[in-house]
Amino acid sequence: MARLGFGLVSCTFFLAASGLYSSSDDVIELTPSNFNREVIQSNSLWLVEFYAPWCGHCQRLTPEWKKAATALKDVVKVGAVDADKHQSLGGQYGVQGFPTIKIFGANKNKPEDYQGGRTGEAIVDAALSALRQLVKDRLSGRSGGYSSGKQGRGDSSSKKDVIELTDDTFDKNVLDSDDVWMVEFYAPWCGHCKNLEPEWATAATEVKEQTKGKVKLAAVDATVNQVLANRYGIRGFPTIKIFQKGEAPVDYDGGRTRSDIVSRALDLFSDNAPPPELLEIINEDVAKKMCEEHQLCVVAVLPHILDTGAARNSYLEILLKLADKYKKKMWGWLWTEAGAQSELENALGIGGFGYPAMARINARKMKFALLKGSFSEQGINEFLRELSFGRASTAPVGGGSFPAITAREPWDGRDGELPVEDDIDLSDVELDDLEKDEL
């Protein structure tokens, strides 16, 4: 059973944006500033709820969550993250709906989704079951407890995506590259560097995956590579610098947690990435590439060219503008003409609201959400924003699989032309005959 999904949440009213828990509760409030210290670097088993204060399901869970936290006190840690306020932390763990509950066991980098009931008793049972399994794993030697990757600089498996640079390799890799580089200058004996290492290593893997290698994380042993250390004025450890082609390096002054580093890297990627492609659905390859190779894809169905003429370009301009605005999300963007992909429209229930129409598809889960507001920059922006926060309702794609796509020629960019009617030759028609017919 999957965790509470994007489409199973129906939080339909808002409350003041205040947390559901207080310091007097046994539930530990978690934020980006303390999450790594409290959870990731802990040997304890953690149950963490990602919630939004306005969510009705979260409000109903609150007393049960508090009850479980009290029962499990000093046995299992029970925490909560306001994911509406701390979106970077929710995004880091793929939170798309509220509440989402995750169990952080031996491997804190791979939490498990909680699949049980929402009562205090069910939560306690699940926690004790997970704790029992953790102890068994430790007894059998399969787990050493805390495993966030703190194996030291010599263990390449813990930092496989961190690129080690030297005086000899730095210029070719960094200065001659079109990619963005975040480079840590460290000293092996430095305690702060050792604390940063697992965060840097884990962030490197996430950044590589999310930016397709366009932002790279690297490390330089400044005690050995003193040419580089002197060139960039390294006086303390760790020092992190950001290198972008054609620009002077700048110091990274953000937080030292994985989420902080990933967030900054994605901002750099967004600033430097070109706008996403907006492709017309002309065959199955185009549709599946944009939907199956991206976490989500946005599909617009525009009116027939004979119904809009030059207005089609206005619609496309709106889509391009919003694709650029949301490029950090790395969604796929598609459009088609009304009636051109009838099976796709049927599978998404498009057409009932008229055209233009829009749907957002999660091809992995075969779920979609429809735009029910205005097809305008403001209306679409609000739709996409609600989706980002997990507030929009979704439904299964009709048929349970990606619909068949009809191959067609791409739009040539010109206005449509009405079919020309054949001229009728009236030379053989006798007017006298017409007058008789009228009589």
Curated annotation (Swiss-Prot):
InterPro entries, from UniProt?
A: PDI_thioredoxin-like_dom, Thioredoxin-like_sf, Thioredoxin_CS, Thioredoxin_domain
**Coiled-coil segments on the chain, per record:** none
Keyword Cell membrane belongs to the record: yes
UniProt cross-references to Pfam families, sorted A to Z = Thioredoxin (PF00085)
Which residues does the annotated region (Disordered) include? 141-160, 400-425
List the catalytic residues. Answer: C55, C58, C190, C193
Instruction: Give the UniProt entry's GO cellular component terms.
Output: endoplasmic reticulum lumen; melanosome; plasma membrane
GO annotations under biological process? platelet activation; platelet aggregation; response to endoplasmic reticulum stress
Q: Where is the Thioredoxin domain?
A: 20-133, 151-287
Q: Give the disulfide map.
A: C55-C58, C190-C193
The residues annotated as site (Lowers pKa of C-terminal Cys of second active site) are R256
**Primary site of residence:** endoplasmic reticulum
Motif Prevents secretion from ER: chain residues: 436-439
What keywords does the record list, in alphabetical order?
Cell membrane, Chaperone, Disulfide bond, Endoplasmic reticulum, Isomerase, Membrane, Phosphoprotein, Redox-active center, Repeat, Signal
- Substrates-to-products reaction catalysed: Catalyzes the rearrangement of -S-S- bonds in proteins
CDD domains listed in its UniProt record: P5_C (cd02983), PDI_a_P5 (cd03001)
Keyword Ribosomal protein carried by entry: no
Q: Where in the cell is it found?
A: Endoplasmic reticulum lumen; Cell membrane; Melanosome
| Residues under site feature: Contributes to redox potential value | G56, H57, G191, H192
- Site feature: Lowers pKa of C-terminal Cys of first active site: R118
Q: What does this protein do?
A: May function as a chaperone that inhibits aggregation of misfolded proteins. Negatively regulates the unfolded protein response (UPR) through binding to UPR sensors such as ERN1, which in turn inactivates ERN1 signaling. May also regulate the UPR via the EIF2AK3 UPR sensor. Plays a role in platelet aggregation and activation by agonists such as convulxin, collagen and thrombin.
Oligomer and partners: Part of a large chaperone multiprotein complex comprising DNAJB11, HSP90B1, HSPA5, HYOU, PDIA2, PDIA4, PDIA6, PPIB, SDF2L1, UGGT1 and very small amounts of ERP29, but not, or at very low levels, CALR nor CANX. Interacts with MICA on the surface of tumor cells, leading to MICA disulfide bond reduction which is required for its release from tumor cells. Interacts with ITGB3 following platelet stimulation. Interacts with ERN1; the interaction is direct. Interacts with EIF2AK3.
In the record, the note on similarity to other proteins reads: Belongs to the protein disulfide isomerase family.
Note the NCBIfam families from the entry: pdi_dom (TIGR01126)
- The protein depicted here goes by the name Protein disulfide-isomerase A6
